[in-house]
Amino acid sequence: MKKVILYSAMALATTLGMSSCGDDFLKLDPTGSVSQGTLSNDQGIDWLLTGAYASMNSMTQTGWMGYASLANYVYGDVMGADANKGSVANDQTDFTQLETYSFNSSNGYISGKWNGIYEAVNRCNAVISMAEKIRDQISDADLIIAQAKYIRGVWMFDAIKNFGAAVPFINVEAYESGTDPLVSNVDESGNYIYIWNLVEQDFKDAIAGLPETWAGDYGRATSWMAKAMLAKLYLYWSSPYNGNMSSADHWGQARDLFKDIIDNGKDAKGTKYQLITNYGDLYNASSPDCDWGGESVVDVQMTIQGTQNDTNAPISTWAAGQPGASGMGGWGFYQPTYDFVNSFIVDDNGLPLTTTQARAKDRLTVIKTVVNKKGEPEDLPKTDLTVPVDPRLDITAGRFGVPFLDYGVPFRFGGWVRDYNNGGMYMNKKYLPTIADRSSGLSVATNPVNSAKNLHLIRFADVLLMYAECLIHDGKYDEAIGYINQVRGRAANDFYKVDDYAGLYENLIKSETNYTAADIIPSGLTMDDKVNNKTVAGTASNYRVGLYPTTGNTEATATTALRAERRAELGMEGHHWYDLCRWGIAADFLNGYVEYEGKFFPNKFASYGKNWVMLPIPFGEIQRGNGVIVQNADWQ
């Protein structure tokens, strides 16, 4: 059983400075319901610190739809063209607005995200403030403060990613003063105040004050986690966006930190950072490699405590479960897009098609009229499993005709897709628990999504790809491809084989009595492994993986490889929209996506704004601030 940090409801309820849902989270209030005397010891301050850690994955804070969580599936995936909202059209209309690019600054999810960030920041400031006040009464105030600054840095970096770098930074002095009006994001001349350097300092302080590992408390912050967050901050700070994020040249600092992490870094258990052997084990709670097996760089630790209310879902929402396939109900949100799935189609060399080529293809899954053994026609979702794809697709997305964890083999819509006319014909997969997890203490029998698998915020594969991006900036294109190929090569190790899921196929044959085994079990399919120069027969789909050429690369070829690899490797992990925005290509890419995906969902999408590289600051905050908080440049 893995050691976990328990995110107790009591810690949440007693955190100083925590506001209730619907409050103005920038109206600072350092007073709380617990006296200083109660917290003026090691147990009390750690209790308070636990409340700050809990902000990193708490559905109490983030709303049961997870719109404020660090998983960022709503923004990184759904706004980033990797996922549709799912469910039905009239469910969660604020979510629909984000999915279809028809939102504005009054959107409830956007307000919830803003409030969630600043609630978490207030929790961190409560810890720092109290630790300073009782420094002489606790064992190690500096260690407590370093952890709180790390968490505050994580959340303020999340604020930058979502709302831009000109947002209020709430430090402990502002928190203690309880000032009203709000903390401003502009100076006296009306110029934006960019907070990059303030978040940078939080991570630097955390690096200086945190240990490399902990003895058992694996979810606590370490200096290596802080280094990874700082390196990623430098990468974003250096990225072009659309010229309105006060970007600066920190490529060298990012590069050096990433190289240090690659060469010397170790995870919370002291394991040197590495790519684990099998990609799918990253999302298999029963695998020792799932969490802290060497690939976890920045994880949010999960725990199972036996009931729905005491248990977290890695993406902070209970709504992403399939509607019945796991043996219990589900809402059917968060479905991979046709565009995303097509991006896994590969060419004869096992390399991804260009975006233009992939969008020229039809969907891999379509409705087909099939004739059963009684001679009766029936319309069913059918996937063309002969088209060669990157095997990471079937670990990331559920496809009809391919085994889905231990749930079964999807054959018809019932139990799998709630409304394919709204969300498409694919299912999310990575962060769902298996049915077997319920009996092994890794999930619960009361909810289809809750799981003990960690939320991976930064994996070692991500570090390798971000380092490659720095090398591309330095003009070292062939060297960058070497790191990209490390990530791509691992994909050849893990794929679906028919014999491994014989029981699931047999169950489907027994239940679908009007169809023969030949209608259900694929045959003649292979894994064409060009990485290791071998072919494996008996696979559930045609798979193919090859490596990028290692010589003669240009900025264009290396950049294309990097961007394709980030989408494939990190798909459905909350990254893609942020990548598109910082690269300055969001409008072009997403309007192309609207054109392609919109063919299958007529009149669903609006166009994506040409300057949108961030969300608007919520209208309510602008209104309450009365000029103190100014709307960001994208949304003026």
Model segments located where?
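Membrane-proximal, proline-rich intrinsically disordered regions
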Residues: 21-74, 368-373, 385-387, 618-636
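Long, intrinsically disordered, low-complexity segments
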Residues: 21-22, 45, 61, 78, ...
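Conserved, well-structured interaction surfaces
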Residues: 41-50, 54-59, 86-163, 184-218, ...
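Bacterial Sec-dependent N-terminal signal peptides
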Residues: 4, 8, 14-43, 199, ...
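Short coil/turn linking the two alpha-helices of tandem helical-hairpin repeats
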Residues: 160-162, 167, 236-245, 475
